[in-house]
Amino acid sequence: MQYKKNIKKIPILKHGLRGIIHGLAVVLWFYSVTNIPMADVTAINYLTPIFTTIGAILIFKEAITFNRIFALILSFIGAMLILKPGFEVLSNGKIAQLFSTILFAISYLIAKNLTKTESTHSIVIFLTFFATITLLPFALLIWTNPIMTDLLLLLGVAILGTLGHYFMTIALSLAPLSITQPVIFFQLIWSTLIGLLLFEESLDLFILMGGALIVIAIVRLSANENLSLKK
């Protein structure tokens, strides 16, 4: 019976709770995508790093430094300049997206807690499993048989999404949430570059200004954190 004492107890309930919360966040996100402009969806989505940082400060007692808060605010301003969302009417789609950001923030906070005892592989695998179970009933309600092109695209999305989550989980295990969250805004710059190179989308002054603010915020944060580590 000695071997049983050496078997690590897996926090299934915590993994399951996170998977359900994350799955419901995805459902709300897809609902908002079909009901409001994509710029508004993306803009509201960038409240997630802010909610996550607030949660990290309250729950994990992470240090509140000027550099971290400044980077978060500056990145958010940069994102708004790029997206130029319109918020004239508070519609159901916008409310759904707001709740989605809150649920995603809770999911990341649970993931941060799990990194204390669980491996990156375990966290990603259990999220995929429980989120899939959560999403399955919603998928069956509107199911249509995908063609081969759709299957390949879905496979690509699944692979890239899993890799993204894998590396994000590694980041959560290595650094405080208040440091990792501002970096999320950097994905907007990559999206803009992809749109420019692959889809011939145009640049304007607001995109350049917003991108510059995000880069300045992240570079400044990284430089200051490196200086703090050397002291």
Regions found by a protein language model. Name each.
Residues 50-98, 102, 113-116, 215-231:
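Juxtamembrane helix-loop boundary signature in multi-pass membrane transporters
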Residues 2-28, 92-100, 145-163:
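Loop-to-transmembrane-helix transition segments
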Residues 88-146:
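Transmembrane alpha-helical segments that form core, pore/gating elements
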Residues 19, 23-27, 49-54, 79, ...:
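Hydrophobic/small/kink-forming positions within alpha-helical transmembrane segments
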Residues 42-47, 114-130, 165-196:
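Helix-helix packing/entry segments at the starts of transmembrane helices
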Residues 31, 48-70, 189-208:
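C-terminal transmembrane-helix exit sites in multi-pass transporters
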Residues 1-11, 79-89, 131-150, 221:
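Membrane-interface helix-cap regions at the ends of transmembrane helices
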Residues 186-231:
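C-terminal-most transmembrane helix of multi-pass membrane proteins
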